[in-house]
């Protein structure tokens, strides 16, 4: 029956700017780029070697409902060495919200893409 999730959408104000951030800053690979009948491109990026892709879709980015306290990330990216990943991304201009936060199960480090979509890195123990 159901086998796997293959796409999720991240709403962006400028597809080219978002593509540059996800490929040149985060190191994702460009996936599919096809025009659609109604105008915007169907544009995806993915972590190297994975089937799961993010659709960079025109829309109202980073506009979730206001919440109290910590806001969950739009998505989480797994890493084996969060300190090295934070250092590398910081050198490419990424600004982390609160640095690396330790939990009993591992570590998280949150940041935002150029459109304000919340992302986080995760390292499990």
For the regions a language model picked out, list residue spans one by one:
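Vicinal oxygen chelate
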Residues: 1-7, 29-80, 84-114, 123-125
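Conserved beta-strand-loop-alpha-helix junction that forms the acyl-donor binding cleft
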Residues: 12-14, 37-38
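Short Gly/charged-rich anion-binding patches and loops
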Residues: 17-18, 84
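Conserved active-site tyrosine of GNAT-family acetyltransferases
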Residues: 18-23, 89, 116
């Amino acid at each position: 029956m159901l086998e796997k999730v293959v796409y999720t959408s991240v709403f962006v104000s400028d597809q080219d700017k978002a593509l540059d951030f996800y490929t040149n800053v985060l190191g994702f690979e460009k996936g599919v780029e096809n025009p659609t009948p109604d105008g915007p491109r169907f544009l995806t990026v993915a972590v190297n070697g994975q089937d799961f892709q993010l659709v960079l879709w025109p829309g109202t980015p980073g506009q979730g409902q206001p919440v109290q306290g910590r806001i969950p990330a739009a998505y989480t990216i797994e890493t084996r060495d969060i300190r090295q990943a934070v250092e590398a991304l910081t050198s490419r201009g990424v600004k982390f919200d609160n640095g690396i936060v330790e939990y009993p199960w591992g570590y998280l480090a949150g940041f935002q893409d150029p459109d304000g979509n919340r992302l986080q890195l995760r390292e499990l123990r």
